[in-house]
Each structure stands twice: as C-alpha cells, then as structure tokens.
C-alpha cells in the first residue's frame, strides 16, 4: 500500500513526510506500549483510553498553577489509577476486563466533573513556554518521535534487564508455576497495570499539548487500535511471549 501511494505521489515517501506521520501516531504507540505489559501477563487494560482523556483535562486545567510539574501530577494520577486496577484484579480476584472497565468509568467520570462536561483549552503562550519543546523538531525529526524512542528504550530495558521484566514473562508463561516458585505474583501484576496507567497518562499529556486542550472524549477511538497494535506485533492475549519491540512494529503496521 505504501509503495502504491508512493508511486502515485512521490512526495509521500519524503523522509520529512514519513517522520511527520510517525510523529502523529506517538500517542497511540505510547498507549500501546503500556498496554503491552498488561497483555504480556495475560490481562487486558480497557481503561487506557479514558485515562488519556482524563489526563488531557487535568493537564489543561492545572498547567496554569503547576507549570511543568503538571506532568508529574499526570503521571502520578495514571500510576495510581493503574495501581487501583491491578489491586482490584489481583486482590479482589476481579477479571482485568471488568476491573479496568470500571477504572475507565471512574476516569471518565472524573474528566466529566473536572471539565464541566465540555472541552477545555490551554493558554497557548503558557503551553509553548512549558511544553513547546514536545511539539517542536530536532532537524526534521519531530520531538514526539524522540520521546517515543526514549520510552521504548526504557520499556525495553525494563522488559529484558530487570527482575520485573523477567517475572512478568514468567507470569505470562505460567502464573501457577511462577507462584509455586515463590514469586509474589500479585505484586508484580499490580506493577504491570501501574506501568500501563503511567504510559496512558503520558499519551494523554502528549495529546493535550499537541491539541492545546482536552476533553472527556478527546482520545476516543484509540483503545481498539492500541490493543490491535499489541496483538499484531505478536503479543497474544494469553501472554508470555512478544514484548514492547513487537508493539513498536505492530504500531507501524
């Protein structure tokens, strides 16, 4: 398909144009990147979209008072809601399909309440002063793409070089066997959901900066593509195989 479009319109294959298009899918990729950790353990995170929506509202409203520290608030909020999903899933034995759907409903309600059920807008000057670098370019490379590569590198390090990554792989391959070997499965599963929530929050922050505002439904339509990016990349819903590099390939596809 790319070859056909490129033949019809040679300008389509210009490096600058391809990089620009890659930059546009960064929020989707970041959301899918976080979801990979949950799918990796055989779960699913249906709250990511609503989480991103909430963060666009929070970032827009509190940018004026918190400045750059609003980013920390957004990530902490995403981590907390993800932790809540993981806690309900592991400690209360609620299937992740239901627990994350409930957390997504909570995030949506919070976004509706904070925004007054309407779209909110950032002050353009303040946005450019605090987060303008996020939507700028380094040469012909969009800075969002650089952020995505950095996050991919961190996720890859966690997956392949840390105890957390190795345990998540073991849990996905066989939860009962992992528990029998003495691993605190619940603790690590909660962390997987917390990571997913944190990255959904970063995706929401990028959304807010790119669009200079937020709304309770601004990221609607991204949940299914994020899940598909994970699955197409080769991380099945049963977990245990695949990984974040696969998700990067799946997102590009």
Task: Set out the residue ranges of the language-model regions.
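Helix-loop-helix "hairpin" substructures at the membrane interface of multi-pass membrane proteins
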Residues: 67-74, 81-85, 138-214
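Transmembrane alpha-helical segments in multi-pass inner-membrane proteins
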Residues: 200, 210-253
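Transmembrane helix-bundle core of multi-pass membrane transporters
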Residues: 92, 96-161, 188-191, 210-219
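Single transmembrane alpha-helix segments in multi-pass membrane proteins
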Residues: 4-67, 88-93, 232-244
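Hydrophobic core segments of alpha-helical transmembrane domains in multi-pass membrane transport
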Residues: 1-6, 35, 104-112, 147-157, ...
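Alpha-helical transmembrane segments within multi-pass membrane transporters and channels
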Residues: 66-104
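Structural signal for alpha-helical transmembrane segments and their membrane-water exit/capping regions
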Residues: 1-13, 41, 112-115, 119, ...
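Hydrophobic alpha-helical transmembrane segments
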Residues: 21, 29, 50-51, 68-76, ...
